[in-house]
A protein has these predicted regions:
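Nucleotide-sugar donor-binding patch of glycosyltransferase catalytic domains
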Residues: 116
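Conserved N-terminal beta1-alpha1 strand-loop-helix module at the mouth
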Residues: 1-102, 119, 129, 135-136, ...
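Short alpha-helical segments enriched in small residues
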Residues: 121-124
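Short beta-strands and strand-loop turn motifs
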Residues: 14-18, 105-113, 160-162
Length: 188
């Protein structure tokens, strides 16, 4: 939680809780702590795949995978939640839009060990194709670093989503601040 608070102190305005190996109880308990933190900093909290838990803890939204329940079904059952969907192709982006997503992530843009299972990097040209093809905010994800953000934005990304470059920093608060200060910090 200290690292999350450091990102929030650095100005990050959205956090996604993505802990697939926790029990429901553990997820709820961690979610409650994160909700308190994010609320204190005026940031949004998204829960990975679990709209029921997102609603239970008062999170702002849920983030779905391409293979999970459709966004419009989540919105029908949980109308107050912002619904995002992970996408890994132009077809997936179109599908997420037609199924009612509020935003999408598109990945991996660059080489990254955490997204290796999704195949080779999509690259900036694919990012541009997606951003021009859908009307949703598109967050570039995968291998994002400070020096790569400008080219993602130039290729139409609304913003970026990342883990490693901030988490692996020895100065999380300051590194988070650099992202938010230098690139406008678009948030959903």
């Amino acid at each position: 939680l200290d690292a999350v608070e450091a990102t929030l102190m650095g100005g990050v305005k959205a956090i996604q809780l993505r802990e697939k190996d926790l029990s429901d109880y553990e997820l709820v308990e961690l979610g409650k702590k994160l909700r308190l933190l994010t609320s204190n900093y005026g940031a949004r909290l998204f829960i990975n795949s679990r709209a029921d838990i997102a609603e239970q803890i008062g999170a702002n939204g849920v983030h779905l995978t391409e293979t999970s329940v459709h966004a419009n079904e989540v919105k029908r059952n949980f109308p107050d939640l912002i619904v995002g969907v992970s996408t890994h192709s132009l077809e997936g982006a179109h599908l997420a839009e037609t199924q009612g997503a509020d935003y999408i992530t598109f990945s991996p843009i660059y080489e990254t060990p955490s997204k290796a299972s999704y195949g080779p990097p999509q690259g900036l040209d694919s990012l541009r194709q997606v951003t021009q093809a859908v009307r949703l905010p598109v967050l570039a994800l995968g291998g994002i670093t400070l020096h790569r953000v400008p080219e993602c934005l130039e290729h139409g990304a609304f913003g970026v989503a990342l883990i490693s470059d901030i988490w692996n920093s020895s100065h999380i608060k300051q590194h988070s601040f650099k992202y938010m200060q230098n690139f406008g910090g678009n948030t959903l």
